[in-house]
Structure formats: C-alpha cells, structure tokens
Amino acid sequence: MERDPLYVVSPSYISPKTIRFGKILVWSSFFLMMVIGIIQILYNLEKISIGFNNWRPLLYSYILWAIAIGYSRVLIYGERGKRNLFIFPAVMFIISIVIFPMLFGLYISFTDWNLSSLDGRKFNGLDNFYQMMSDPYYWNSLKNMIYYILAVLVEFAIAFLLALLLNSQIKGRKFFRVVFLIPLMLSPVAVSWMVGKSMLEQRFGPVANFARWLGWETPTFFSSPEIARLTMMCMDAWTFIPLMIIMLLAGLQALPKEVLEAAKVDGANKWTMFKNIIFPIMLPVSLTTLVIRIIFKLKLADIIIIVTAGGPGGATDSVTSFIVREYRDRSNVGYGTLLSFVYLILIIIFMTILIRFVNRWLQRAS
C-alpha cells in the first residue's frame, strides 16, 4: 500500500530534510512573487524596459506562493499543519482583498493619476502630500468633522431621553417603538431626496412654508454656512438616532428590577434614581453606543453629496464627501487616494485614543 507523503502522526517524526525543503519551498515562491512584483512596478514607472503587459504574472505567482505555503505547513508541522489548512483559504482571501489593494493604493497615492489626463499615471513623489498640506478645502472638511463628531453628544442625549420614554409604562409604547425606527429603515439616499431635496426645498417645501408661517421671510436652509451645517447634522441625526435608541433601550430593559424597586421603597425620586442608579449602570452601554455612533459619523458622506455637494463653499463637507468629489468630479485618483490614506491614519489614531479613554473610564467606574 502506497504511503501518503503528507501523513504524519507527530512533528517529531518529520525529518530535518523535509522541514528544510518546506522552508525553501515557501521562501523561494515568496522571493519569486516579490521579484515579479518589483519588476512590474518598475516597468509601469518606466524605469526599466523589461516587464509584462499586465499584472497576471504577479497573480499567478501569488497563487503559487499560496499553494507553497499550504504544502509547506504540512511538511513542517505535520498534523497541526493539516489543521491550519482549514483557515488558510480565509487568510489568503483577506490578503487578496485587503492587503494587496492597500499596497496598490499606497502606490497610487504617490502618482499624479488623473482619469481626464491622456498621459496616464506617473510617479510624482510627495507632490500630493504637499498639495494636501496647502489645500484649504481639505482642512476645512477636517474642521467640519469636529463639529459633526461633537454633535454626537447631542444625539446621545436625545436618544437616551427617548429610550427612557419608550422604556416607561406609557400608552402605545409598542407603536412609538416602531415609529421611531422608521428613519433607520430608510437609506440615507432616500432621506436625502425625501427631506433635503423635497421637504426643505426653498420655494414649495412644507418645512419652508411652515418657516414662513412662523415669520422667517426667506427660509433658505442651505445658503448660510452655519444653517447648512446644522441642517446636515439634523438630517444625519434623524437617520441614526433610532440606532442609538435600540442599543440604549436594550440596556435599560436589562437593568436589575430589584435595585430599582429597592430605590423606590427607599423614597428615591426619578431624578435620584437616574443619577445614582440608571446612568452609572448604563455607562458601559452608553459608551459603546457613543463609540459605534462616532464610527458611523466618520463615514458621513452620502447625505452631504446628494443634498449640498459640500456647499456652500465647502461649509458642509466631510472628509469622506470631499474625497468622493475628488474622485468623481475632478478625477484626481492619485490625490484622492493619498487623502484616503491620511484620513485612515487619523481615524486609527483617534479611535485608539478614544477606546483607551473609554476602557480607563470603565475601569474607574467599576
């Protein structure tokens, strides 16, 4: 009976020669992939005259490297290597759709690639970075993001009050729970057209007519920078406050009933119960809700793009909407990609600091 060459009982039975062959196999295939990738990059940058017409050789070398890794894991680790093969396809898939696109995007960010140019993309070093440092509209969008993120605190206060209301014994609370969730069921694009383009329309919109009835002679919601920014905040809040309500309501319903009943017996009023019992116990849920809402806020773009296109004068631009317009309106792929990478780095730094602050606060509270 022919012996399975991959079958081993324990790594101790694997010969040093087999282990050495497995390491040589994976490193040689990796070296081959890197050489092909470097040659192709230099060829596209017109630094060398030898190269390939497309990126298929790099794809084939990547597939060869993946096969070599899987086979070498079995050769080196035996049965444990076979178990690793079950997660190996997922790991290689993540590398394919995350790591490689990020590396390609990093390369694009150092080029002058513009889709309207007939010259194609060329390496321009740090020119895109210098352009970003002197771009007032980009820094204005970063300043706007500070306003948008601070608005999350107001959204949280409104969501907490509504969650307390829906958690109380009021008539028709099941009906109101469904009604409050309707904005969350709508897509931001639908909200943009339904509210921003229709209800807030200056001439015939019902909200504008109501504002005239209240005494506002020219109700323009998007002509003034401050009013336009506030309108964007309200539209985005109307869409995502229901999500915060769901999370906070789940936390309120999980509160221990015995503690609340004991506080009532001791004569505590509603404000005392909220300040000393409900809010401290709800602190982990509240902070989690704030973090998740901030993550969604950092991606704010669709409402702004459809309703105001960043206007007036960039007053409502978020970083994401500004980057989208660099791609779509100006076709600046290289510059827009650099802005995306810089924004990604800022988000990672900000969220790391925020999560550490939240963890320390929770540790002190506990």
Q: Which positions does each model-derived feature cover?
A:
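A structural signal for multi-pass alpha-helical bundles of membrane permease subunits
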Residues: 36-57, 78-366
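Transmembrane alpha-helices
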Residues: 1-79
